[in-house]
Amino acid sequence: PDIVTPESLNSEAGIQTLRAGSLGDLAVAMSGSAAGHGATTGLIVMSGLMADEYAYSGTFPTRREADTRNLQDINSDVNTIYGNLHRSRTGAETTVDLLADFGGNPEIESEMQSVTGYAYVMFAETFCGGVPFSKAPADGGELIYGEPLTTEQMFNQAIIWFDQAIANAGSNDKLANLGRVGKARSLLGLGQMDAAAAEVAAIPTDFVYNIEQSDNSRRQENGIYIMSTVRRQFSIADGKGGNGLMFRSSMDPRTPWDGGTEFGQDDITLYYNQLKYDSSNAPVVLASGTEARLIEAEAAANADDATTVEDIHNALRATIGLSDLDLSGISGDDLLLAHFSERAFWLFSTGHRLGDLRRLVDVYGMMPSNVFPWGPYFKGGEYSTNLKFLVPQSESNNPNYVGCLD
């Protein structure tokens, strides 16, 4: 703060600095980084522990809390993710605000509005309701404390930002599609499956928008790679807690791995290394045409249209040489679970799985004990019935803070 002052950002060059900072904060919030004591965990690996993607093979108690879902509101890893998501959001909002003083730049506005929308989505999918969204004035004035929002309100706020992003994208299809996938993802969270499918219908399957990582600094390195391959703390799971998917034993090319011959960082847990991110500069997909097709498939599954679900999935599987699925005779919850299984393999370790499992419970009405890891925990104790990150106690400096609403 003593190097980059609010006054120095109030220029066209400053706007580019703010944009880069917001994208950097989003990258750290999502994938983590090599910086910090023991590196920095991101939402992707921590939410993967809360779900069935990863098992913890390290010694940090805050990360083991996520593996069992037995979280405290003083969990430092969750607090870091929470702060980085908010920093990314407020940086993007400030960028949009300052652009108005320089005649505007619709493409930068669109990208930053989508970044803001994705922050709301990530909070809605992974945290409990009750997250306040405070405003940091562009002139460096006092923080304007936000009111806590329910999960539904967070998804609705995301849609408002994505609508603005789509409108400002103009002829830039990549930015328009980024906003459309984000809006559709929000609509899924609200249970509006047909509207979500309609939103992504025109997106080509080969579309992709990446969160970029780099070897330029430790902060820019891919934290998923650092936490798994380098530090051996996050082991790719297999049938976690009884309900988890077989991410290893399926030998599926979408979840490549190696290992099983040495222990993790804790020296007691056999370690299985993910290979999806094979270097410290491997990018992370934020939105894609593949996700667009999966959204369409979910709408079809919700309508009990097994033929369409099968056609969409087999077209995707053919792109990487996988054999066809046969979903004939499958309906209802079984069809939904077949779809969600495929979706989990395509979107493995991208920050979707916890939100997907919560949607199976909150939108589709399935029992948590039938979809989340459940029962005895492999290091002793039980998996918690909690399904979400808590609003950190650090937010209690906000006079509107109430903890979790839902």
Specify the residue positions occupied by each region the protein language model found.
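Membrane-proximal, proline-rich intrinsically disordered regions
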Residues: 1-43, 325, 365-406
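Conserved, well-structured interaction surfaces
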Residues: 58-126, 164-173, 280-284, 302, ...
